[in-house]
Structure formats: structure tokens, C-alpha cells
């Protein structure tokens, strides 16, 4: 079965997102997203430069994890808060990241491949050094950081982990940047949670979320339209989907809708949360 975008559903989801201001979405990340909390806390403890660079490099290896994403970033925080204060320069941060990937059980699947990927990225030394010394580059010129990583890694397009790495590093810098949003014009990184939201919202017809992860183009077109229509940058839409996208896969639709509304209500107006949940969860997310 070929995937199909249902544009009428895309417009309904976009309308629900358009009820939110960018300030509300940033506030949601700050209050609810465990990734933001851990990375920004690390930046406050050891400095934005080291926190941003280490998050950037670890983000590149954040695939095929042997633990949930929330546990992975907690493992990152605990390791880096003890190892980064002693790290000196780019080489020191790289060694700290290698130590994390070697010791954290979440990296057990393909550990050597993860280490090789991070070491290849280190060839973009000029840009990585700028992230360390002037981390605001992640807000002021994020596309340059992303392009340097792409070239260093030999990627023709942008892998989802490469885009994600810039986003997670940006979290370390945002408090310094006056809560400026990340406006990278890139396709949304489609992981399991985004794939499930694409199906459960009925924006994308597909046999399973695995099919959407393997062939993400339809989902990326749909979420790109949602971002343009709502005015919410796609990587901030991604934050909401990352926190809520597990529910349609693990719960029946009615329970999943309630769970998503409850999560959104932690930081958003209840009426807006219920409306958005009603558009995001309309059917189960099949695994295939």
C-alpha cells in the first residue's frame, strides 16, 4: 500500500496548532520536554559551550538506542556533569563524548558505529570549535552548523539524527538567546513517535509506522505544511510530537487522546490542549 497524504486532515491539524503562539510552544518545551530540561540544566551547571557541543555530538549517535530517549538523555546528563568540567577544548569534549558512548548501556546497539560517526563529525573542527567558543552560532547561523556536519559525514541529504543534533544542542543555548526559536528550514526528523502521530492524526495513510519511518517523505510534506500554515517552526512541532507521540502506539485511541490532552495541559491552556489532542489522535498507530 502506497502512502497518501490527506490534505484536508493536514489543514485541520494546522488549524489546531495555529491556536498556539510560539511562546506557548517554547514554554511547553521548557516545562514538559525532559530533553530540554536536562540539556539546559547541564548548560547552567558547566557552561553553554561545552553542553551544546557535547549534546551536538551525542545527538549524532542518538539512533537505535537500547533504552527510551528520556533515559538516554538522563544518562548523558549524569555522565557529562562529572566529565565535562575537566574537559579542555574540542579534543577534551570529544573524549568525554566517547566516554559516554562507551559506558552508557543505551549505546550498546552498534556502539562502534556510533563512535565512528562522532569521530567523522569531528573533522568539522572549525565549526565545532565555534560552537564551543560561541554557542550562540546555533541560534544565529544554525544552517551553517548543519551543513558543516552534513559535509563532514558525507551525507547527500540530512539524516534525521543530524537535524536532531542541531536541535538538541540549541536547547543548551536558548536561555542565552532570549528564547529565540530554531527556524531551520528542514524536513521534520521522522522517528517512531512522529510516524505514529502522522498516522494517528489521519494526515498520512500508511500500513504501519515502520513504513513511515522507512519512507518519511509523505509525513515530511504533511508536517511541513502544518508548520507553514500554523507559523510554528517544524522542529518545535517535533517537540510536541516527541513528548506525546508514544500514546497512539501504546493506548487505545480514547485513552491516548486523554493522555495527550493531559500532557499538553501541563503547560498549555486546557481548551487548546484538548483541541490539539483531538486532532492528533483519531485512530490507532499500527506497527505492522
Swiss-Prot record:
Active site positions: 160, 191
Keyword Mitochondrion annotated: no
EC number in record: 3.2.2.-, 4.2.99.18
Top-rank taxon: Archaea
Catalytic activity, as annotated: 2'-deoxyribonucleotide-(2'-deoxyribose 5'-phosphate)-2'-deoxyribonucleotide-DNA = a 3'-end 2'-deoxyribonucleotide-(2,3-dehydro-2,3-deoxyribose 5'-phosphate)-DNA + a 5'-end 5'-phospho-2'-deoxyribonucleoside-DNA + H(+)
Annotated segments matching region Helix-hairpin-helix: 134-203
Binding annotation for 8-oxoguanine: 35, 62, 73, 164, 189, 238, 242
A molecular-function term among this protein's GO annotations: class I DNA-(apurinic or apyrimidinic site) endonuclease activity
Function comment: DNA repair enzyme that is part of the base excision repair (BER) pathway; protects from oxidative damage by removing the major product of DNA oxidation, 8-oxoguanine (GO), from single- and double-stranded DNA substrates.
Free-text note on domains in this protein's UniProt record: Contains two alpha-helical subdomains, with the 8-oxoguanine binding site located in a cleft at their interface. Contains a helix-hairpin-helix (HhH) structural motif and a Gly/Pro-rich sequence followed by a conserved Asp (HhH-GPD motif).
Similarity field: Belongs to the archaeal N-glycosylase/DNA lyase (AGOG) family.
Name of the protein in its database record: N-glycosylase/DNA lyase
Amino acid at each position: 500500500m502506497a502512502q497518501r497524504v490527506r490534505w484536508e486532515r493536514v489543514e485541520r491539524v494546522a488549524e489546531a496548532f495555529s491556536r498556539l503562539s510560539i511562546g506557548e510552544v517554547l514554554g511547553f518545551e521548557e516545562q514538559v520536554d525532559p530533553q530540554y530540561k536536562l540539556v539546559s540544566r547541564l548548560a547552567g551547571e558547566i557552561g553553554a559551550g561545552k553542553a551544546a557541543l557535547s549534546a551536538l555530538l551525542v545527538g549524532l549517535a542518538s539512533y537505535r538506542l537500547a533504552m527510551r530517549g528520556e533515559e538516554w538523555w538522563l544518562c548523558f546528563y549524569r555522565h557529562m556533569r562529572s566529565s565535562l568540567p575537566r574537559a579542555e577544548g574540542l579534543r577534551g569534549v570529544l573524549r568525554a563524548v566517547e566516554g559516554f558512548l562507551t559506558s552508557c548501556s543505551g549505546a550498546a546497539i552498534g556502539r562502534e558505529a556510533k563512535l565512528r560517526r562522532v569521530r567523522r563529525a569531528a573533522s568539522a573542527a572549525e565549526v565545532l570549535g565555534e560552537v564551543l567558543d560561541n554557542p550562540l552560532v546555533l541560534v544565529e547561523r544554525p544552517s551553517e552548523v548543519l551543513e558543516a556536519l552534513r559535509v563532514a559525514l558525507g551525507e547527500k541529504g540530512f539524516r534525521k539524527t543530524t537535524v536532531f543534533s542541531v536541535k538538541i544542542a540549541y536547547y543548551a543555548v536558548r536561555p542565552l538567546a532570549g528564547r529565540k526559536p530554531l527556524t531551520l528550514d528542514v524536513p521534520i526528523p521522522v522517528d517512531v513517535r512522529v510516524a505514529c502521530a502522522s498516522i494517528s492524526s489521519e494526515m498520512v495513510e500508511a500500513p504501519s509506522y515502520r513504513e513511515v519511518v522507512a519512507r518519511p517523505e509523505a509525513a515530511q510534506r504533511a508536517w511541513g505544511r502544518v508548520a507553514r500554515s500554523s507559523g510554528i517552526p517544524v522542529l518545535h512541532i517535533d517537540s510536541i510530537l516527541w513528548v506525546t507521540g508514544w500514546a497512539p502506539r501504546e493506548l487505545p485511541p480514547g485513552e491516548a487522546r486523554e493522555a495527550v490532552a493531559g500532557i499538553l495541559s501541563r503547560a498549555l491552556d486546557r481548551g487548546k490542549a484538548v483541541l490539539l489532542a483531538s486532532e492528533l489522535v483519531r485512530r490507532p498507530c499500527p506497527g505492522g
